[in-house]
């Protein structure tokens, strides 16, 4: 099933500071949204499910639920990159515009943000995945926290030997910056 492009573009323009918790609960009950709680903080990570992809039941909450971290009241604490679509999933013409091209790396998405003075890593659907924990270790070892803007969410590709997806990077163990998103506004920050 193809989705009309104009409908999708409306969903991407989202600078709300809160998400509708009631709508999220409804989406979870219908099997379209996965919600996992942080073990230490009153935070929740939202991720769309494979059912959402199969049924193509997209709304703004689901398009942005790709590692979206929220507080109990729905305040957005961290924003990852929204869902991206394959060319055969969208009906309509994209308008020509400026773009930047990046090399696609073959690792896992790691999301870094700050909450009440603490740096936190997660993946699309977990605060405690091996990839999130390794990303934290790599960051501590190689980078300085004072260099990051605490009002932003950082999206990385985490690559290390034990996390080989398809491409074998040998002994490479590092974080590769994909994007920086201002958490309150949802706007991309120039890298």
Where are these regions (language model features)?
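Core nucleotide-handling region used for phosphoryl-transfer chemistry
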Residues: 1-191
